Amino acid sequence: VKRARVVVVGSYNQDHVWSTDALPAPGATRSGRYGGGPGGKGFNQAVAAARAGAGTVFLCALGDDATAMQARALAAAEGIDLRDEVHAD
C-alpha cells in the first residue's frame, strides 16, 4: 500500500488565552490565568494529516524567534516536513 502524501500551505500561530471567573466591573481589576499553545489552521491540518499516516509537507513562513523554534520542534516531533519553509526575518 502506497503512503498518501499531503502538502499543506498555511500558517503557524501561537495562541494566547487569558481567562477569569467573571468580567471586571468598570474600574475594577481581576486576577486571571494565562495559557497558550500551538495553533493555526494550516499547522493543525498538517498535524492531523501526519497523525493519520500521510507523508506531510507544511509550507509556511517562520522567523527566528522562540515561537518559530517551537514550531520547528513540534513539526519535527509530528514527522512534518518543513524543508521548504519561507524564512521571514
Predicted regions: what they are:
Residues 1-59, 66-70, 76:
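Glycine-rich phosphate/adenosyl-contacting loop at the front of the ribokinase-like
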Residues 59-61, 85:
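Structural motif
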